[in-house]
Amino acid sequence: NLPKLPNSLTVLLCYNNNISILPELPHSLITLYCWCNKISKLPELPNLLTNLLCYNNKISSLPKLPDNLEKLSCSNNNIKELPELPEHITHIVCKSNLLIKIPKLPISNKLIYLDCSRNNLAELPRGISTIEKVIYSRNPIYKKIRKLSYLELYDINNK
């Protein structure tokens, strides 16, 4: 595991290291890349954090997301619920978890990319139509959506 981190640290790259516990994160941290470890719980996230890539771990829940967070990639974990989404979030990749719903989108909704495929989603939040790219395949919601008369579907699974 990692030692105490310097107070002035802005970028922490600790991916592919078999880490199970992260130490307290410095308030100056802007980028945290901790994918492909054995982390089950993240510490409190600094408010300056804009990029969080924590996919391929053993995380079951995320802490409160910082107000400045723009990019979140938390795929291939055991997350059942995402915390409230911050105003500045633009990209979320949360595929291959245990999610049953996506939280309400922020009023400012700056989200341009959402990949929530391979979860247990039965519904999508209001305002989803303003997002440029949404990937929601392999969710129970797919059965409801394909019944919409104005929607054109393309099956790309066997091509």
Task: Report residues per predicted region.
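Short "repeat-start/strand-capping" segments in structured domains, especially the N-termini
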Residues: 7-9, 26-30, 46-50, 66-70, ...
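Low-complexity/repetitive intrinsically disordered segments
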Residues: 1-4, 10, 14
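Conserved hydrophobic beta-strand positions in leucine-rich repeat
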Residues: 11-14, 32-34, 50-54, 72-74, ...
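Serine residues within intrinsically disordered or low-complexity segments
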Residues: 8, 20, 28, 40, ...
